[in-house]
Amino acid sequence: MIVNRNKPSKNTIFDFDSIAKLMKKLFLSFLSVLIFISCNSTKQVAENEHMLTQNYIYIDGVRNKSSDLQKYILQKPNSKFLNLPFALYLHNIGNPNKPKTPSEWGKKNPNSYRFVKTIFSEKQSIAYANSFINLNKWFLKYQGPEIINKKKIKRTADNLLAYYKTQGYFKSKVDTKVNLFKDKKATVEYHITKKNPTLLDTINIKIESKVLDSIYKNAGTTSLLKSGDLYNDKTFRNEANRVLKLFKNNGIYHFTESSLGFYIDSTRTDYKTNVGFLISGNRLEEKQATYVNTPFKLHKVTEINVITDYSFTKKGEKLKDSVSYRGINFLAHNKVKYNPKYLAQSIFLKPNEIYKDTLRKLTRNHLKSLKNFKSTNIKFNTIPGTDNELKMDVFLSPIEKYTLGLETEITHSNIRDIGTSAKFSISNRNAFRGAELLKLSFLGSYFNSNNGPGWEIGVDASLEIPRFIAPLGLSKLVPKQMSPRTLFSVGSSFQKNIGLDRQAFTFLSDYKWQYNLKKTIQLEIFNTQYIKNLNINSYFKIYSSEFSNLNNVAKVYDAANNISINYPLSNNKDNQVSEAINFMRTVSNDNNFRATNSDEYNKALNILNRYNIVTSDFLIPVLAYSYTYNNQTKFNDNNFSFFKARMANSGNFLGLISKNTNANNKKTFSKIPLAQYFKIDFEYKKFWDTASNSVFGFRTFLGAIIPYDNSDIPFTKSYFAGGSNDIRAWQTYELGPGSRNTGLEFNVGSLKFLTSAEYRFDVISKLKGAIFIDAGNIWDITGSSFVDDDAKFNNLSSLEDMAI
């Protein structure tokens, strides 16, 4: 097991460890003062009142600690952090009886008020008084003591009783007990006696309409209500929802849940109940100021209109342009700017087909996914003169065709000094009249480095098409209901005084579709990157520890051969790399030195191998498949699971057709070294909402990359450990591989395992806190002879090298 050394980075401007220690001392001092001042948590509790400190729930005499029942409790103790009610402590520093206006404060503190008024002015004395008043208000805004409230206790008992009745415990009861203590504190006990649950007995279904009866029977589905099952309100709700969807998706447009009724007998003494399920054949309809019963009928959509440039300001204005495509009318106040052929692919309800609610929802979601419209509104109206024909109107409010974006950021890390970065983008929606999104982005960054000003510039262009673009009819393999999308992207970036001044060119072509609401699939057909290093002469300036290690080898080599021509190696930038390379090649061919000084010999070969990998140009043609599962229903949903698997291969096709190799026997394409590897990544995240605005999260990641055909792994595709989104106790690239403490600036591996657990909570007001533990490491699994044994993953015993 590896524990963080917490040593300050030699490249940082500030001693962050000293700052952290100072902040820790200040926090502990503040905490001590806070607790000392407010140690009496009941100081603002009146003599005839008691503060709630704990709720206890007992089910059939056994204490229940589950959080499931907590949502039914209306009165809860003051929130705590580290088992201390900080918000209450802050509240108790304030005093509700203190003056609330400057005049009241002046009467309470006449000497101070007159002193400020005499020295300065009346206005300043009022401001002085307000500063104390506002400070007192600030303390009082935090949660005060939770006083026992008998009405809330009674309502909580009613809530618990109602809950257990929904679970079929009709004979259950809830008793309460309030324990009052001399220190003005109290606890509340809720004693729940469930008794026996009720079972479903005979189930009778009555359908009052021949049309509905025919749909119900032809569906061939099975009811969720079954004789002998435990009574549960949720089952009845699910059954009602099932039947509602059945009719709404088979042409019964006006059908609602109010037409469904369940009848049960909860008075039987044998803990069984008969169930009557009534499906009404009529609906209430308002006609001429009176309500009449109208039989349900099968509705079909006979007219579809799509207004492509709707806005509230144009409501009621005449539509000047119209285009029809396959029975769908596309209308506009000015001009229809969308190709009807492509926009019609998002309309799943068709003319003269029966109404289906799922197709209405699918149409709305598909139109939203086009990223071309601010809002999408769909309305249905009965066509005058008919009683079963619908007109469908789709109102689309387009986003501005051209939009600009600007992002700026100040950055600092152990990799780069403090600097600034900016990104400017321009988006063109509906670029080719098919709801495409064309985006052009420019990015740049600037910072100071030891080698002078450093900068990076880049440009990216992407075209997102809301359908598949593929030859030979392959575009039809994925149905449009899955919102298929094609993305083409090209980009280039250039660096100066950043690393080896890398120049990169990227071309991407991928396909993405949503298998269902929770599952997404992505296929990267052609994800190709060309990386060229323009300044390899800076290698030993960047990897200075490598140069120090090589100098130590040179010292031993000179001593072993009784010469003094290699040590120390040149510090001259123009000669440094060539001299170091010549020296390493000399050592690699010296069998006598290998026999007498094997450690130094291997160290020189390792440095030479790393130099060749890091400085090498690479062509990286990737074919990848990704599967993502995410059951998060909305942005603020804190109960969800996330899983992603990605499998990638680089260089397989080009490796087969290319027979060329370079001097290092590495396969090349157009004289560029070809990256050939298989890579697979798995990531799983799970979050639980633990109530009281607290969330517990778990994350694990496992990834492996294996080269083949004598290829090396490009540095940019290797795994690293450390950083704010990784193992947070280590800086980026600092950890690993394995149990090695290399002292190198950039450590990478071909296997990575990471796991973390985190508890997030509210401290006070909007101040958030988190407690977390990270564990993991990187290892080498390539089997390379240039890698030390303590950096390799040999078997499960290597997991002992995990850092925490």
Model-derived features with residue positions:
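Bacterial Sec-dependent N-terminal signal peptides
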Residues: 1-51, 163, 700
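Transmembrane beta-strand segments of outer-membrane beta-barrel domains in Gram-negative
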Residues: 249, 454-456, 460-697
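Transmembrane beta-strands of outer-membrane beta-barrel proteins
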Residues: 215-218, 258, 379, 395, ...
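Intrinsically disordered, low-complexity acidic Ser/Thr-rich regulatory segments
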Residues: 117-149, 322-340, 580-622, 668-673, ...
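C-terminal transmembrane beta-barrel domains of outer membrane proteins
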Residues: 40-43, 346, 419-427, 433-466, ...
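Flexible glycine-/small-residue-rich
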Residues: 61, 192-196, 207-209, 277-283, ...
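Outer-membrane beta-barrel initiation region
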Residues: 289-480, 599-600, 609-639
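Interaction-mediating elements
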Residues: 40-369, 478, 496
